[in-house]
């Protein structure tokens, strides 16, 4: 019989100043079910945690990094020993996998490479380099309520307020020396123009080698070969940085695993179309991260294998299914109230988890990775992205789509009206929702609540009207 256990992590600045992070574990290995008052107390703990990270980043960056790592490791204990039972087992596993991915660069930065989200990481994996991702780290800093000081730091040094807040957060944290020096940096110009500023700045700041992959916007075989040639040079670059040899045979096997993983994830989304999958706001983002950064690993294939097993046991569909285009403002109470573990409506897929098709030949590993990049759904004309979104929304059985206009993302903001027209021509209602996936100060919670609530009510009204028409037709 378990007794309630409390783990205290004490961070002492002065005798009168303590920060206690409590991890409650009961006999059923569940988080203690909280009342509204308890939830408020938990939020206060996170706010205090974030405040200390911000404070110590000014006074002692090494201490701030230690606190960041220790808090995340404590959260990982929760994921391992008291997971959220509302999630499918595969998604409980995914939460641990994603947290491991964040912690490792803090523990072993010399074995990590800073990368952009759509960098093909199979070559890095072969050399034992772990992805140290800008967007992922900024998400976790925001979840720790520590992003504001880093955003302000970046802006104070001349970074534009309109630059993507994920990039600004990471730059600010690096400038404050909270984030450790990597082995090297690998990035691509794919989809995000902020990459061109961020990674060059980081390379200069950390004084580490950098490799850029140039991906042309046009989809053709010449461009596939052009990128493949660059990836062969990337192999040489990584070998020089690490002193480890990469063989085409083992790289080919890793690309076979990547292909299987993408195929099985697509199959899962199709099988989930008529099922109820309880969803929070972070799991779709985790899938978007790991299906890019960890593609080719045994861990990511294990995740999709577990998904295929879990979906067969899922109950019949409940409520409305929402497909989400671009990043998700996981911190938003307005979005949580409508879509977090709600039977009335759930996020059933995120664009970022399916940005390329598994139509590549793994026996030609460099061409395979190059094809993924050149034919990436977000590369080139906006219509390609929109058509991919329509296809995937239909496969997941989506009743509606949210097109999230993340602050500073010109690609998404510029295509919003075209996307709305194209989706609705296919019979899929679309809500354009502006906001920020990382920076709470750009929240607009009142507007988000009003517009998202009205959109979901509209979807339900349309269903009721269709049901009434069907009943009238049957009576006639």
What are these regions (language model features)?
Residues 92-106, 110-163, 171-175:
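An N-terminal, globular interaction/scaffold subdomain
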Residues 117-118, 123-153, 323-394:
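Redox- and metal-dependent alpha/beta enzyme cores, enriched for Fe-S-associated oxidoreductases
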Residues 337-351, 362-372, 376, 381-468:
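Hydrophobic alpha/beta core scaffold segments
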Residues 158-175, 378-390:
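Glycine-rich, highly charged phosphate/nucleotide-binding loops
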Residues 3-4, 14-18, 30-32:
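Polybasic, lysine-rich low-complexity intrinsically disordered segments
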Residues 39, 44-111, 228, 232, ...:
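A charged, amphipathic alpha-helical module
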Residues 168-237:
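Acidic/His-rich segments in extracytoplasmic proteins that coordinate ligands and/or metal ions
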Residues 9-11, 23-25:
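Short hydrophobic targeting helices and cationic amphipathic motifs
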């Amino acid at each position: 019989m378990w007794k309630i256990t409390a783990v205290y992590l004490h961070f002492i600045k002065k005798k009168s100043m303590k920060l206690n992070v409590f991890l409650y574990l009961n006999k059923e290995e569940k988080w203690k079910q909280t009342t509204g008052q308890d939830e408020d107390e938990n939020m206060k703990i996170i706010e205090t945690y974030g405040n200390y990270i911000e404070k110590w980043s000014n006074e002692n960056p090494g201490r701030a990094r230690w606190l960041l790592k220790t808090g995340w490791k404590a959260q990982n204990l929760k994921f391992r020993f008291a997971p959220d039972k509302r999630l499918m087992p595969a998604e409980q596993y995914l939460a641990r996998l994603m947290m491991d991915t964040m912690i490792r660069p803090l523990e072993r930065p010399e074995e990590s490479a800073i990368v952009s989200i759509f960098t093909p990481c199979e070559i890095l994996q072969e050399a034992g380099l772990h992805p140290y991702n800008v967007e992922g780290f900024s998400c976790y800093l925001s979840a720790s309520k520590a992003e504001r000081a880093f955003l302000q730091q970046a802006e104070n040094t001349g970074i534009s307020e309109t630059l993507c807040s994920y990039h600004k957060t990471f730059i600010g944290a690096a400038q404050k020396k909270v984030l450790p020096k990597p082995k090297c940096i690998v990035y691509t110009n794919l989809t995000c123009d902020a990459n061109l500023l961020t990674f060059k700045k980081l390379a200069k700041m950390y004084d580490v080698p950098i490799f850029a992959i140039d991906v042309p916007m046009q989809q053709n075989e010449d461009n596939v070969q052009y990128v493949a040639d660059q990836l062969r040079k990337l192999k040489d670059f990584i070998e020089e940085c690490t002193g480890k040899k990469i063989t085409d045979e083992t790289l080919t096997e890793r690309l076979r695993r990547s292909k299987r993983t993408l195929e099985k994830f697509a199959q899962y989304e199709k099988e989930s179309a008529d099922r109820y999958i309880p969803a929070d706001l972070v799991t779709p983002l985790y899938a978007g991260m790991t299906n890019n950064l960890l593609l080719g690993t045994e861990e990511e294939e294990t995740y999709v294998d577990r998904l295929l097993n879990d979906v067969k046991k899922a109950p019949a569909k409940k409520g409305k299914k929402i497909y989400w285009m671009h990043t998700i403002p996981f911190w938003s109470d307005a979005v949580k109230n409508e879509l977090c573990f709600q039977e009335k409506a759930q996020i059933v897929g995120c664009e970022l988890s399916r940005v390329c098709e598994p139509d590549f030949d793994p026996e030609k590993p460099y061409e395979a990775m190059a094809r993924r990049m050149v034919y990436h759904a977000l590369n080139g004309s906006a219509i390609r992205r929109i058509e991919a979104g329509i296809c995937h929304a239909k496969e997941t059985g989506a009743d509606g789509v949210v097109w999230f206009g993340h602050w500073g993302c010109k690609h998404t903001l510029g295509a919003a009206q075209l996307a709305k027209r194209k989706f609705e021509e296919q019979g899929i209602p679309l809500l354009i929702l502006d906001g920020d996936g990382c920076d709470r100060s750009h929240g607009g919670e009142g507007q988000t609540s009003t517009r998202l609530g009205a959109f979901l009510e509209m979807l339900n009204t349309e269903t009721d009207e269709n049901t009434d028409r069907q009943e009238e037709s049957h009576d006639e």
